Regions:
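Short, well-structured beta-strand-loop connectors
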Residues: 18-29, 56-66
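Short beta-strand-turn/beta-hairpin segments enriched in glycine/proline and small hydrophobics
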Residues: 1-11, 28-44, 71
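Short alpha-helical linear motifs
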Residues: 50-51, 67-70
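Short histidine-centered loop motifs in beta-beta connectors
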Residues: 8, 14-18, 22, 51-54
Length: 71
């Protein structure tokens, strides 16, 4: 299982997947907002979303776990 981490401190603007979703390498999982910029967090590999640890509107710190993906 792979932990997908936040690359920045900001807030969760939009979640594009659900638990159980199949994702491909490079698919956008969530969109974060920081200083009025949108940052797309992408899947590091093909797999299944096992857990989402954030919800829309959450404030997050750099390196917080966003999701867990099983290969």
């Amino acid at each position: 299982m792979t932990e997908v981490l936040s690359p920045i401190t900001g807030s969760v603007w939009k979640i594009l997947v659900e638990v159980g979703s199949q994702v491909n390498d490079g698919d956008t999982i969530v969109i974060l907002e920081s200083m009025k910029m949108e940052i797309r967090v992408k899947s590091p590999h093909n797999g299944k979303v096992m857990e989402l640890r954030v919800k829309e509107g959450d404030s997050i710190l750099e390196d917080d776990i966003i999701a867990i993906i099983e290969q």
